[in-house]
Amino acid sequence: MTTHLDNMNSRKKQNWETPIDQFMEWCSRLGLSPAIDVCATKANTKCAKYFDKRSNGLKKQWTESWFMNPPYNEVAVWIRYAWNQFKEYGQDGLILVFNKTDTKWYHEFVWDQSKLKNRPNVETYPQSGRITFLENGTLPENPAPYGSVWIVFSKTKLRERLLRQCGL
């Protein structure tokens, strides 16, 4: 679940959904199989298990591999919590957020971490073009007004994950 700014009138909208084809493509491409969607609704979850607003993923332990497309007005809070959960439990995480490399959270939890030696693996994959997120299961007229980036927190590198996915 996420909030995007509407292209036409800058109103904030809730409950935008990651298109399932995008989610599946990136999971396959990155060798990931998230077990839990940590900020979703029953209608838009991408995983068999999910935390919704009522169960509050920010108060849960993420002891399984996870996916998140957080509310855009709360990205910093969710990224910080995701990083802490990753450090504590070491489960692979896949994150879809807006591609704004000038933000404090991006530098603190993505860019700075990727430069550290002996660090957990942090990978970024900018999305080509703009994603057209679903609204209540249907495509709106316009895509998101900015680009997106897929971020991976993992203890294993991409090559190792892909080999594992192939049973090697």
Can you annotate each of these PLM segments?
Residues M1-L168:
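Class I S-adenosyl-L-methionine-dependent methyltransferase catalytic core
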